[in-house]
A protein has these predicted regions:
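Short beta-strand segments
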Residues: 15-19, 76, 141-143, 167
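Conformationally flexible catalytic loops at phosphate/diphosphate-handling active centers
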Residues: 5-69, 208
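Short internal beta-strands
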Residues: 17, 98-105, 164-167
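Phosphate/diphosphate-binding loops
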Residues: 122-173
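Glycine-rich beta-alpha junction loops
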Residues: 18-24, 79-81, 170
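Phosphate/pyrophosphate-binding active-site segments
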Residues: 41-46, 50-51, 58-61, 65, ...
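Short acidic, glycine/serine/threonine-rich loops at helix termini
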Residues: 26-31, 85-89, 112-117, 150-154, ...
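Anionic-ligand anchoring segments at beta-strand to alpha-helix junctions in alpha/beta enzyme folds, i.e.
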Residues: 55-56, 62-139
Length: 214
């Protein structure tokens, strides 16, 4: 279970707390190995540790409606895309919906060159990308943190946009745009696959031309 937790959702270290008799090397009654329930990760024989990993269709369906009516959408993609192995799905989603995407430092270099791949946003990014976010009417955060490297001024960050945050775990939203963010607690790859399966081809030629002009 600890190994599963460390690799699923938002990967990271897991602290194992041992009972004091074991930690102090005292005698302890341990189950024989054949009585321990083993986890078969390859065959998905995994305890139900994270209910939030399952697709929450209601939240994704709300995002689909917003995508369908949006005229100036943009995606902010981060290292969670790489951790989920969802690079192909991100590109497929972007091509299907004609939505340009920016990549944070944790994803830069993992996505191929493409007209929809705008590169870095925020304090280390390109001015035109920040202009695109500022003038957007829909921002889709996926696999990226809501940090101050991109959200330089919360009051001026995409002031006229809906903001969706696709994040499989529930770390909370600890910044000044929390009241504007719609949380979608879904794995990046699964969410993109669901969106691809339930969206039709969309074009945003005028929006892309506007971004190019900047």
């Amino acid at each position: 279970t600890a190994y599963f937790i460390s690799t699923e959702g938002r990967p990271g270290p897991v602290v194992l707390e041992l009972p004091s008799p074991i930690a102090q090397f005292q005698k302890a009654k341990l189950k024989p190995i054949d009585e321990i329930q083993l986890i078969d990760i390859e065959n998905n024989n995994i305890p139900n540790v994270y209910n939030e990993i399952k697709i929450r269709k209601s939240n994704l369906n709300e995002l689909i409606k917003s995508i369908e009516k949006s005229k100036r959408p943009i995606t902010v993609a981060g290292g969670g895309i790489y951790n989920a192995g969802a690079m192909k799905e991100l590109l497929q989603f972007s091509i299907l919906t004609d939505i340009p995407f920016t990549t944070t430092l944790m994803l830069i270099g993992a996505m191929p060159k493409h007209k929809l791949n705008l590169g870095l946003p925020g304090m280390h990014g390109f001015p035109e990308n920040n202009l695109a976010i500022y003038n957007s009417d829909l921002v889709i955060y996926i696999g990226a943190r809501l940090d101050d490297r991109i959200i330089l001024d919360p009051e001026k960050f995409a002031p006229n946009a809906e903001i969706f945050w696709i994040e499989p775990n529930n770390p909370g939203i600890g910044n000044k745009i929390a009241n504007r963010v719609k949380k979608v607690e879904v794995d990046a790859k699964e969410s993109l696959r669901y969106l691809i399966a339930n969206l039709k081809q969309i074009k945003h030629e005028k929006w892309l031309e506007q971004i190019s002009s900047w």
